[in-house]
A protein has these predicted regions:
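Soluble non-cytosolic domains of exported or imported proteins
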Residues: 30, 40, 67, 71, ...
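Conserved small/polar residues in nucleotide/adenosyl-binding loops
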Residues: 173-179
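Active-site-adjacent "gating/activation" loops or surface patches in catalytic cores
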Residues: 1-54, 70
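Hydrophobic, well-ordered secondary-structure elements that form the walls
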Residues: 42, 77, 167
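Long, amphipathic alpha-helical stalk/connector segments used for oligomerization, subunit docking
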Residues: 86-155
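Post-HExxH zinc-binding segment in Zn-dependent metallohydrolases
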Residues: 52-53, 63-97, 115-117
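Active-site-proximal helix/loop microenvironment
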Residues: 149-165, 169
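Active/binding-pocket-proximal capping segment
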Residues: 43-47, 53-57, 62-71, 110, ...
Length: 180
């Protein structure tokens, strides 16, 4: 099953016990230390795991567990992941390492945006694989196997990347707006 699972995910605990809190890291997905650190930030503390425990400790009504906003949930975790990159960068002594970490986060952000644009194109405008390939070509992605794989994944998982890409600024704006 490893080849079909996400690189990592947090298993939300049952409503009646709130435990166990499990983070799964797919061993078939090779990760650098930086990617592992930011993944654990996203999935664990202070990402999904923290968000779930904090929410549970507010003792919400049961219906609030059933009605959720995946955009807000993934937006929060992506917001936290961005801080994971910044945190890692702060602990590097050399500028090249810090620049690499910054570039890695920017690349991740751009990929989320590209995949979200593809999702809108495919599922709203009905783009074919050739039309999706035109967008990918603008970003230097021309390998036909890669294009086919990206296209097929987005076809099979509608709106998956939108909750990360568009949920992130919603979470960020909510957390940074001054209160009056």
């Amino acid at each position: 099953m490893q080849e079909y699972l996400s690189p990592a995910f947090y298993l939300t605990p049952p409503l009646d016990t709130r435990t166990p809190n499990i983070i799964y890291i797919n061993p078939s997905d090779q990760r650098s230390n930086l990617e592992l650190f930011t993944t654990l930030s996203h999935e664990g503390f202070p990402g999904h795991l923290y968000q779930t425990i904090f929410f549970g400790n507010t003792e919400p009504s049961d219906i609030r567990y059933l009605i959720t906003s995946s955009g807000y949930i993934e937006g929060w975790a992506t917001y936290i992941e961005s801080y994971g990159y910044q945190y890692a960068s702060n602990y590097l002594d050399d500028n090249d390492g810090s620049d690499y970490v910054c570039l890695t986060w920017l690349n991740r952000s751009i990929n989320l945006c590209i995949y979200s644009l593809l999702d809108i194109g495919i599922h709203y405008y009905g783009w074919s694989q050739d039309e999706a390939a035109r967008l990918l070509k603008l970003f230097g992605i021309t390998n036909t196997n890669a294009i086919s794989e990206i296209y097929q994944y987005i076809v099979e998982t509608p709106a998956n990347y939108l909750k990360y890409c568009w949920g992130y600024p919603v979470s960020y704006t909510h957390l940074t707006l001054p209160t009056t």
